[in-house]
């Protein structure tokens, strides 16, 4: 995996949280928490926490006595996440690699990961670590995006950028966030990691945004797609963003727009 594929630094965390989180992450976060609440966990680990959208939902919905440890590979994302919570006492923030978790065996009742597994360079190793830190009977709940053609905004942005850089189209969105969607492959990785009880559902929702420009900002400047654009021509970031916005407006209209998002939600028990 290219280092830039998992690097959320510089201005990316702020733009990500401002534009991308409300666009595509809030509904799936609430869905994950609903699934976790069924088992009433007392100690929850979150991996790949990003700017804390799932963390905030966990803190809001789970009992005050539930302890939450939120980890991410990128310290910049955690730093931004910590500024968004007004009652941080129950949450521990820790920069940690999901493939090498710094916790003892059987430390948590539940492990949650929102849209992070796609970035694991070794999927089974990441799942094996989640299983290792789970107590017997514990639950690992995570989601991954479906293929890019089932996620309309991301698909239009990717197509638009191919016209900006026809000789070397940026492929980050199709390759990473939307590149790990095969249910059989996911199940195989979990089985190799030692999970035996595995369930998978598909979550479909409608994403809304105040404008096409907001969506273009979310993807072009709030994800590592920005790094791909700038690697091709740093001076064309604004042009690439605007070309994406124009393509979105042509397809979805002016003013507020909406488009389909789709993800797979997986529950695996230890």
PLM regions: where:
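Conserved catalytic/acceptor-binding region of the Class I
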Residues: 124-125, 132-210, 226
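Short SAM/SAH-binding signature in class I
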Residues: 45, 107-115, 263
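Conserved alpha-helix/loop element of class I SAM-dependent methyltransferases that forms part
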Residues: 22-42, 57
């Amino acid at each position: 995996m290219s280092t830039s594929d998992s690097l959320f630094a510089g201005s990316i965390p702020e733009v990500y949280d401002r534009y991308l989180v409300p666009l595509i992450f809030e509904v799936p976060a609430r869905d994950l928490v609903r699934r976790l609440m069924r088992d009433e966990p007392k100690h929850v680990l979150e991996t790949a926490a990003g700017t804390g959208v799932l963390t905030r939902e966990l803190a809001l919905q789970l009992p005050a006595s539930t302890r939450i440890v939120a980890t991410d590979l990128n310290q910049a994302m955690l730093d931004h996440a910590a500024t968004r919570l007004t009652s941080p006492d129950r949450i521990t923030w820790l920069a940690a690699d999901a493939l090498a978790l710094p916790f003892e065996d059987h430390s948590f009742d539940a492990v949650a990961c929102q849209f992070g597994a796609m970035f694991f360079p070794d999927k089974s190793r990441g799942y094996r670590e989640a299983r290792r830190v789970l107590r017997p009977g514990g639950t690992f709940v995570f989601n991954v995006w479906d293929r890019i053609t089932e996620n309309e905004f991301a698909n239009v942005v990717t197509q638009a950028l191919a016209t900006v850089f026809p000789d070397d189209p940026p492929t980050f969105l199709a390759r990473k966030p939307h590149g790990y969607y095969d249910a059989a492959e996911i199940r195989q990785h979990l089985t190799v990691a030692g999970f035996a009880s595995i369930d998978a559902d598909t979550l479909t929702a409608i994403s809304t945004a105040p404008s096409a420009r907001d969506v273009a900002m979310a993807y072009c400047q709030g994800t590592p797609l920005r790094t791909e654009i700038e690697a091709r021509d740093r001076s064309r970031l604004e042009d690439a963003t605007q070309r994406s916005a124009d393509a979105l407006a042509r397809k979805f209209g002016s003013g507020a727009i909406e488009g389909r998002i789709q993800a797979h939600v997986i529950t695996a028990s230890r």
